[in-house]
Curated annotation (Swiss-Prot):
It is found in: Membrane. Its cofactor is Zn(2+). This is Aminopeptidase N. Gene3D superfamilies: 1.25.50.20, 2.60.40.1910, Neutral Protease Domain 2, tricorn interacting facor f3 domain. One of its GO terms (molecular function) is peptide binding. Its EC number is 3.4.11.2. It comes from Haemonchus contortus (Barber pole worm). Zn(2+) binds at H379, H383, E402. Binds 1 zinc ion per subunit. Its main location: membrane. It catalyses: Release of an N-terminal amino acid, Xaa-|-Yaa- from a peptide, amide or arylamide. Xaa is preferably Ala, but may be most amino acids including Pro (slow action). When a terminal hydrophobic residue is followed by a prolyl residue, the two may be released as an intact Xaa-Pro dipeptide.
Length: 972
C-alpha cells in the first residue's frame, strides 16, 4: 500500500493516546502531570537517568548479550511509511501532558522469510498502542492476538493468531507514542537562546548505532535495509527536514499544524533515518549535477555557514567523480546543532553536526579548526557512499564504514583545501600515531571482531575502528598504487550499492582488480590473504634490524606490545596468523634518497643484501606501513650520525617515523632513552612540522611521568634546551599576522605548538607574553555581560592559550572574568576555549567546582555533550592528575547519576580521570571501583584504564630515577 492510500489520524488526540501520553509523562523522571509547555527547564526535563533496570545494579552486569538483542530472521522489511507528530513548546497550544512527546504511526511492508506466528521489532522507551495496531495481507485483515513488550531486550512482539507463510507479503500498522528526551538518542531535544534572551527548543534525531528503535518500532539492524517514506506534522512557526527532499514545498497548513512530506529514500539501514523540527534557517547552493545543498543553523549563526556550503559542494562533486557513482539523492542538507552527542552523523541526505564542527569564522577559528571542519565535512560526505550506499552487515565490521570514511576524508579535505600533500602528511600526526598507540595495548581488538555484549557496539566506535582502519587502507594504497586502489573501491561500491557487505566482500573485489602486484612469495599478491592478517588479528609488528655480515642485514619481526605482561581478551588471544604479518617493507640505504620496497614474510626472517651493511638503514621510509622499526645499538648510532650530518637525506615523513619509533622502542626497554635524546640533538637544525611535532609529542609523554615531582624541573629545562632554537624562531606576532594564509598552515601550527610547549615547560618569557595579551585584550576591553566574541580581538590561533595562561597566571580575578565571558558566550568553539581556560586554574578547589557544575544536570553551565571535555580540560592541568582520580573514586555515583545513560560519555570520562595514576595503590583503588562501583562493570574503559595505568606505574619504576639523574646531570 502506498502512502496515498493511508488514513492519517495523528492530528486527533484519541482517548487511548491521551491515556498513554499521561502514563509516559508521569513515568519520565523530572516530568509531572502538570507540565506546561512554557519554556522552562522543568517543562522539558525529559531526562533519562540510570536505574537498576538499565544497568543491572551494583554487583553484576546483566545487560543482554548481542545475540539476545538480535532479531529473528523470519521477516524482512521492504518499506516503512512513517508519520510523526512533534509537540514542541513555545509555538502552538496543545494539552500540557503532550509537551515534549511525539505521536507516531508507521506502516511496515514486509515479506515472510520463514513461517512464523509472531513479528518481532526493535522498540525502546516508546509505548506501542495495541488498539492502534493492525496487520493485513492483501485485502485480508489478520488478527493480532497480543502485543508484548520486552524492555530488557529492546523488542516488541506481535503474536499472530494464524501462521504467516513463506513469501507472504504483509503490512503491519503500528500506533505509538514517545518522548522527546535529552538522551541524545532517537528523537531528542536541542536547546539554545536567541540574542534577545528567548529560549528555544528544537527536535532532532540521532539513531546510530541502535537508537532508531527509540524513534519508531522497526528492524533496527544494519542488514535490514528498506525504503523510508517520512511525513512530519509540526507546529506552525517551525520547519521540518528529513532524509528525502520535501514533496509538498513548505508543507500543508491545517490550523496550527504543518504537514511536511518527504520523498521516499533509497533502500537504507534504519540508523540513517533522520528528522529535525526547528526554526533554523539555511543558505543554499547546488552541485554541478543538480544536487541541492543546504546548510542549516540557528538564525544568528547563518553567517558562519558559508565555508561549510562551499566545502560540501566541492567535496560531493569530487566524490562523484572519484567513486564514479552519482550521488543518489536530490538534495543534501547539513545541520549545525547546539546539542549533539558525536562530532557529526552521516544520515543519508541529512547530515547532523555539532556547531563547532560545521560553523566557521576566521576571526575565531584557527587554521587547525578550519582544517578540522574540512575533514569532518569530507568524512560525513564520504559516508554517503561508505556506510549509506554500502553498509556493513553488522557492527563487527564497523571499520568498513568508519575506517574507509577516515581514510577518504583526507582525500576529500585535500580537495577542499587544495592541498593534498598537507592532508597526507597530517595523517601521520592525527591518525597513524593514534592508531599505533591504541593497538599497542592488550585491551585493543581486531578491526573485524566478534561482538558479545550490547555495550561493545558503542565501544566499537574507537581509534582502532577509525584510525587503524584508515592506516591499513593507506598502507594498501601505497602497496598496490593509487589508481588500482581507487578502481577497486569504485567496483566494491558499485557491486554492493543499496546492500550490505563484510570485509571478505571488499577483499574479494580487490582480488579481482589487483592481479599484477608481487606478493611476499614472489607470486601475484592475493589481497584477501594479505589484508586479513591486518584486520582479523589485533596488534602490529615491530621490525628489528641487525647487521648479519658486511653485506647483509637480518630483519625479523615481533608484535609490538606496550606491556608484554598484559593479557588480551580470550577471544583475541590465538589468532589464525599467530600475531605475524606479511609486511611490505619500504626502506632507505646509506645516504641515498631512493626508497626501495621488498617483503618481510610472516614465517621467516629477511636476509637483505645491501651495498654496505655499515651504512645507516631505515625501515618504513616515507611511513606508509602500519608497523614500527628498531635497530641494534650500532644501527641507531648510524642513523643518528646521518641525521647530524645531513638530515635531509630523509624526507620529513621518514624523519617523523624515525623519531616516533625511537620513542616507542625506549618505552618498551628495547633501547635506552639516552639514545632517543642523542637522536634529538639534530633537532636544532630541524624546521619541518612532522619531525618536530612528533618530537614534542614524545617529550610530552615523558614529562607526564614526572608530573609535579621536584625532579620535573631539570627534565623541563633539558627539553627546553632541545626546542630553544625553534622557539627563538617562533613569533606570536607572525602567527597573528599570517594565520589566514593557508599556504603557511604547517609553519603557523608549528610555531604555535612550539610556543605552547615552551609555556608548558615553564618558560616565563612565554607565559608573560600570553598574560600581557590577556590583560590588554580581555581584562581591559571586555565589559560586564559581554561575550568574548564581542570584545576580545585576539588572533584566532592564540585565543585558547591566552585564556589559559591568563587564568593560570592571574588566578581568581582572571578566572572570574573568564567565567563571566563563558556564561555570556554563544559560539560553541569559543565556549570550548573558555571552559578549557577554567581548567587551567592552579587551585584544586576551583577545578573541583568546575567538575561539580559540569555534572549538575539542573544547570545549563556545561552542555551534557561537553562533560567529557570538561574532565579532559582538568586532566590536562599538571596539578589535576591526582585530584581528578580522587574525584572519580569519590564521586562515581554522581558521575553515573549525571551521564550514566550515555555509555560513551562515561567511557571518555574514565580515561581522563585515570591518566595521572602514578602508584599501585591507585590501581588497586581503580580495580575496586570497577568491581564494586554502581554499574561500573558495564564499562570496558576500566580494563583499558587499568592496563594503561599499570604501564605507567611500571615505567616509573623502571625509568624515573635513572632519567631524573640523567636530566639533572645534563642541566648542571
Amino acid at each position: 500500500m502506498t502512502s496515498q492510500g493511508r488514513t492519517r489520524t495523528l492530528l486527533n488526540l484519541t482517548p487511548i493516546r491521551l491515556i498513554v501520553a499521561l502514563f509516559l509523562v508521569a513515568a519520565a523522571v523530572g516530568l509531572s502531570i502538570g507540565l506546561t509547555y512554557y519554556f522552562t527547564r522543568k517543562a522539558f526535563d525529559t531526562s533519562e537517568k540510570p536505574g537498576k533496570d538499565d544497568t543491572g545494579g551494583k554487583d553484576k552486569d546483566n545487560s543482554p548479550s548481542a545475540a539476545e538483542l538480535l532479531l529473528p530472521s523470519n521477516i524482512k522489511p521492504l518499506s516503512y511509511d512513517l508519520t510523526i507528530k512533534t509537540y514542541l513548546p513555545g509555538y502552538v497550544d496543545f494539552p500540557p501532558e503532550k509537551n515534549l512527546t511525539f505521536d507516531g504511526r508507521v506502516e511496515i511492508s514486509m515479506v515472510v522469510i520463514e513461517p512464523t506466528k509472531s513479528i518481532v521489532l526493535n522498540s525502546k522507551k516508546i509505548s506501542v498502542i495495541p488498539q492502534e495496531c493492525e496487520l493485513v495481507s492483501g485485502d485480508k485483515k489478520l488478527e493480532i492476538e497480543s502485543v508484548k513488550e520486552h524492555p530488557r531486550l529492546e523488542k516488541v512482539e506481535f503474536l499472530i493468531k494464524s501462521q504467516l507463510e513463506k513469501d507472504q507479503q504483509i503490512l503491519l500498522k503500528v500506533g505509538y507514542i514517545g518522548l522527546i528526551s535529552n538522551s541524545f538518542g532517537g528523537i531528542y531535544q536541542t536547546t539554545y537562546t536567541t540574542p534577545d534572551g528567548t529560549p528555544k527548543i528544537a527536535a532532532v534525531s540521532q539513531n546510530e548505532p541502535i537508537d532508531a528503535r527509540r524513534m519508531v518500532p522497526c528492524m533496527d539492524e544494519p542488514k535490514y535495509k528498506a525504503n523510508w517514506t517520512v511525513t512530519v506534522i509540526h507546529p506552525k512557526g517551525t520547519k521540518a527536514v528529513s532524509n528525502g527532499i520535501e514533496v509538498n514545498g513548505d508543507g500543508e497548513i491545517s490550523g496550527d499544524w504543518i504537514t511536511s512530506k518527504f520523498l521516499t529514500t533509497p533502500r537504507m539501514s534504519s540508523y540513517l533515518l533522520a528528522v529535525m523540527v526547528s526554526e533554523f534557517e539555511y543558505i543554499e547552493g547546488e552541485t554541478k549535477t543538480g544536487v541541492r545543498f543546504r546548510i542549516w543553523s540557528r538564525p544568528e549563526a547563518k553567517k558562519m555557514t558559508q565555508y561549510a556550503l562551499q566545502s560540501g559542494i566541492k567535496c560531493i562533486e569530487f566524490y562523484e567523480d572519484f567513486f564514479d557513482i552519482r550521488f543518489p539523492l536530490k538534495k543534501q542538507d547539513m545541520i549545525a546543532l547546539p546539542d549533539f552527542s558525536a562530532g557529526a552523523m552521516e544520515n543519508w541526505g541529512l547530515i547532523t553536526y555539532r556547531e563547532n564542527s560545521l560553523l566557521y569564522d576566521d576571526r575565531f577559528y584557527a587554521p587547525m579548526n578550519k582544517q578540522r571542519i574540512a575533514r569532518i565535512v569530507a568524512h560525513e560526505l564520504a559516508h554517503q557512499w561508505f556506510g549509506d550506499l554500502v553498509t556493513m552487515k553488522w557492527w563487527d565490521n564497523l571499520w568498513l564504514n568508519e575506517g574507509f570514511a577516515r581514510f577518504t576524508e583526507f582525500i576529500g579535505a585535500g580537495q577542499i583545501t587544495q592541498d593534498d600533500a598537507r592532508m597526507r602528511n597530517y595523517f601521520l600526526i592525527d591518525v597513524l600515531e593514534r592508531a599505533l598507540k591504541a593497538d599497542s595495548v592488550a585491551s585493543s581488538h581486531p578491526l573485524s571482531f566478534r561482538i558479545d555484549k550490547a555495550a561493545e557496539v558503542e565501544e566499537a566506535f574507537d581509534d582502532i575502528t577509525y584510525a587503524k582502519g584508515a592506516s591499513v587502507l593507506t598502507m594498501l594504497r601505497a602497496l598496490i598504487g593509487e589508481e588500482k586502489h581507487k578502481h577497486a573501491v569504485s567496483q566494491y561500491l558499485k557491486k554492493f550499492s543499496y546492500s550490505n557487505a563484510e570485509a571478505t566482500d571488499l577483499w574479494a573485489v580487490f582480488d579481482e582488480v589487483v592481479t599484477d602486484v608481487e606478493g611476499p612469495d614472489g607470486k601475484p599478491m592475493k589481497t584477501t590473504e594479505f589484508a586479513s592478517q591486518w584486520t582479523t588479528q589485533m596488534g602490529f609488528p615491530v621490525i628489528s634490524v641487525a647487521e648479519f655480515n658486511s653485506t647483509t642485514l637480518k630483519l625479523t619481526q615481533s608484535r609490538y606490545e606496550a606491556n608484554k605482561d598484559a593479557v588480551e581478551k580470550e577471544k583475541y588471544r590465538h589468532p589464525k596468523y599467530g600475531f605475524k604479518w606479511d609486511i611490505p617493507l619500504w626502506y632507505q640505504e646509506g645516504d641515498k634518497k631512493e626508497i626501495k620496497r621488498t617483503w618481510l614474510r610472516r614465517d621467516e626472517p629477511l636476509y637483505l643484501h645491501v651495498s654496505d651493511a655499515g651504512a645507516p638503514f631505515v625501515v618504513n621510509a616515507d611511513r606508509y606501513g602500519f608497523y614500527r622499526q628498531n635497530h641494534d645499538a650500532n644501527g641507531w648510532k648510524k642513523i643518528i650520525k646521518q641525521l647530524k650530518d645531513n638530515h635531509e637525506v630523509y624526507s620529513p615523513r621518514t624523519r617523523n617515523a624515525i623519531i616516533s619509533d625511537a620513542f616507542a622502542a625506549a618505552a618498551t626497554d628495547a633501547i635506552e632513552y639516552e639514545t632517543v635524546f642523542e637522536l634529538l640533538n639534530y633537532a636544532e637544525k630541524e624546521t619541518e612540522y612532522l619531525p618536530l611535532e612528533i618530537a614534542m609529542s614524545g617529550i610530552s609523554s615523558i614529562l607526564k611521568y614526572f608530573g609535579t615531582e621536584p625532579e620535573a624541573k631539570p627534565a623541563q629545562t633539558y627539553m627546553m634546551n632541545i626546542l630553544k632554537p625553534m622557539y627563538e624562531k617562533s613569533s606570536i606576532d607572525f602567527i597573528a599576522n599570517n594565520y589566514r594564509n593557508d599556504k603557511l598552515f604547517f609553519q603557523i601550527n608549528l610555531q604555535k605548538d612550539v610556543i605552547d610547549m615552551f609555556c608548558a615547560l615553564g618558560s616565563q618569557d612565554c607565559r608573560k607574553k600570553y598574560k600581557k595579551l590577556f590583560d590588554d585584550e580581555v581584562m581591559n576591553k571586555c565589559r560586564d555581560g559581554q561575550a568574548a566574541t564581542e570584545c576580545v580581538r585576539i588572533a584566532a590561533p592564540l585565543r585558547s592559550s591566552v585564556y589559559c595562561y591568563g587564568v593560570k597566571e592571574g588566578g581568581d580575578y582572571a578566572s572570574d572574568k573568564v567565567m563571566e565571558l563563558y556564561t555570556a558566550e554563544t559560539l560553541a568553539l569559543e565556549k570550548d576555549f573558555l571552559r578549557l581556560a577554567l581548567g587551567c586554574h592552579k587551585d584544586v578547589t576551583a577545578l573541583k567546582g568546575l567538575l561539580l557544575r559540569a555534572l549538575d544536570r539542573n544547570s545549563s553551565f556545561v552542555r551534557m555533550q561537553d562533560i567529557p571535555s570538561a574532565f579532559n580540560d582538568v586532566a590536562a592541568n599538571p596539578i589535576g592528575g591526582e585530584f581528578i582520580f580522587n574525584f572519580l573514586i569519590e564521586r562515581w555515583p554522581d558521575i553515573i547519576e549525571s551521564i550514566g545513560t550515555k555509555h560513551t560519555y562515561v567511557e571518555k570520562v574514565i580515561p581522563a580521570c585515570t591518566s595521572g595514576i602514578r602508584s599501585q595503590q591507585q590501581i588497586d583503588q581503580l580495580k575496586n571501583l570497577q568491581k564494586n562501583g554502581m554499574n561500573a562493570r558495564q564499562f570496558g574503559a576500566f580494563d583499558k584504564a587499568i592496563e594503561r595505568a599499570q604501564n605507567r606505574v611500571d615505567w616509573i619504576k623502571k625509568h624515573f630515577q635513572k632519567l631524573a639523574a640523567f636530566f639533572k646531570k645534563a642541566t648542571l
